[in-house]
């Protein structure tokens, strides 16, 4: 296969949703149909004690929530599929944001009973800002749900994107029996699922005009379907490929990830419509995926994927050129040459060594601490720099220190590694030895921090909540002693030695700004390429 053909067959996408919409389950079912796994283990199925393939960290298995982004790959129908499974919990929006920076399209998962929820809105906004195509999968249609017309209206009003249903749920008053495929004018009815969604199912199919289908559905349901089809054809948005690619129209699919219903048709249509790797803006130029000069963007760092070795793996998305095992590349931020040995690809904790990879692919490489999230790797002869990722301002703060002072070294190492991952933001208060101030966007992050330090580094934490909810970065050099009105604030340094003011609330911050008119306070720190 030529280099160009390899690039064109890549599909790299992220799945975004509110917690509990069924994201991890959908990810698993896509892997099931892609042949990457042969038996899907439901997160919630306690009987078999199976855990979702993409939830690999111990705390995720226990709680049934995704707190790290997994990277999963499989081949289907000639396409090489890279799924970026993002954290569903709202406290991990920063990790999710970074993952979306590595995706070429997004699948928005919506619970048919709940519609558009808070986290979906936030993640949708990020996807829209990136200008990537967004596909909608309305999940759980095997349960009682809202009217699909209501959902279409809600998506259009709340998210500001037009919808085009590719299939349509068949039923009356929120009780659905199957789906109608609009393009092929066929009906597919739910099959009775005795395997609880662990295996692929054959379902009952037939043409809309098939008398047997009318008989199976019953007169009332069949007539309701005909009425819905007519209304959709007259009042709905027609399918427009260019609008989908521009992120102005979202193709809608209905199904049930738990029972595998509608997953295969969705996967096939999605792969047909979703884009191959897109050009990416660097500071110097627009980088074309078909360029032969290698470039990659670090979007995630994960410490301790193998708890026995305390390893640190840097995940990068290849943006251009062909990757070959053992190749040497330039790390732009340190200007050092790095040899990329032992590159890996993952199905959760299952690793395979990669010989080569192409634009759109995600690979993980071992790193001793040189690279950071948002860094660029490129060919020596053709230097490019991708822009940094934004930092989400933390809203919760705590001072953490080791209960056992003899574990100071493990504490320092653990905190540094977890901060490099972006799991939390850490700050140091001058003079406060053996402790860090930790900033998070949600309380669950503190729980995960405590859990991981204990389980991965053997450190029990002392955790004291601090009375601050606002962080402001000071732009430029300022004599801290001359700042006015900061008696009740805390002055700290972030991991890049930038000065940060932590203060109790926005009103107090406004007062400090008034007292210091010559000082610029930033909500987020300036990025590398803005300096």
Where are these regions (language model features)?
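Structural and coupling elements of P-loop NTPases
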Residues: 1-531
